A protein has these predicted regions:
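Specificity-determining recognition surfaces
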Residues: 105-106
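Bateman (tandem CBS) regulatory domains
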Residues: 109-113
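DNA polymerase processivity clamps
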Residues: 1-99, 114-232
């Protein structure tokens, strides 16, 4: 159920776009997937094998209730038909109407090859992003991520008019294929949310340029997180 909560985290609260307030559950190639997005970030989880064709947009509020009631249980039975879905947890069942509509073609946002790939220790990265976030309040949480392949350093920078420039760096493995600087601006809260969802000691940051989607991967292949860059 951890994968459910980590996916539903990025669903939208904007009721004018009801499809984005839900989580898309679907099957493809014999696997069951769950994906959500608010238009600024996206999370995809690979859940389990599925022999049935599934395509349903579930209200994120329903999934939040499922996670709350699940407790220490590791399995939940799911049944859906037409416009309803039911979750069976021991002696409790939760039934909800599905959100009507077609989910966005999100896979086109996920880069298959990237010009820039940075691998860092996840815990160390979280530390310096938290520091940068404190200095980034004037810029609506925007921070600059920059990789230096020569020095093998990843720097996180934020700028304020009162406190000036704050930069922290950590060691990183950096692969650069492009000619442009290995740099991108991201929302610090969105980045911290993603880093806290990923599992494993290391995290990979992959992108194709400062205006391209940023793909973040942990050490487990069942979860992918994407953040759209901040234009600066």
């Amino acid at each position: 159920m951890k994968l459910i909560s980590r996916t539903a985290l990025v669903s939208s609260n904007d009721t004018t776009r009801p499809i984005l307030t839900g989580v898309y559950l679907y099957s493809q190639g014999g696997q069951l997937y769950m994906v959500a997005t608010d238009g600024y970030r996206l999370a995809e989880s690979q859940l389990t094998e599925s022999k049935q064709d599934v395509s349903a947009i579930i209200p994120s509020s329903t999934l939040a209730e499922v996670v709350r009631l699940l407790g220490d249980l590791t399995e939940v039975e799911v049944k859906y038909k037409d416009d309803q879905i039911t979750f069976l947890l021991d002696n409790v069942s939760i039934t909800s109407r599905l959100i009507d509509g077609k989910f966005i073609d999100y896979r086109q946002l996920i880069p298959t090859e990237t010009n820039y790939q940075i691998t860092v220790e996840r815990a160390e990265f979280i530390k310096i992003v938290k520091v940068a976030e404190l200095f980034a309040r004037e810029s609506a949480g925007s921070i600059i991520i920059e990789g230096n392949p020569t020095d093998r350093l990843l720097s996180v920078r934020s700028i304020t008019s009162q406190l000036g420039d704050n930069t922290s760096s950590i060691e990183a493995d950096i692969v650069v294929k492009g000619t442009e600087p290995c740099m991108v601006s991201l929302n610090s809260k969105f980045l911290l949310d993603a880093l806290n969802c990923l599992e494993g000691d290391k995290v990979r940051i992959m992108f194709n340029g400062k205006l391209a989607p940023v793909l973040l991967l942990g050490e487990k292949p069942d979860y992918r997180h994407i953040i759209m860059p901040v234009k600066s």
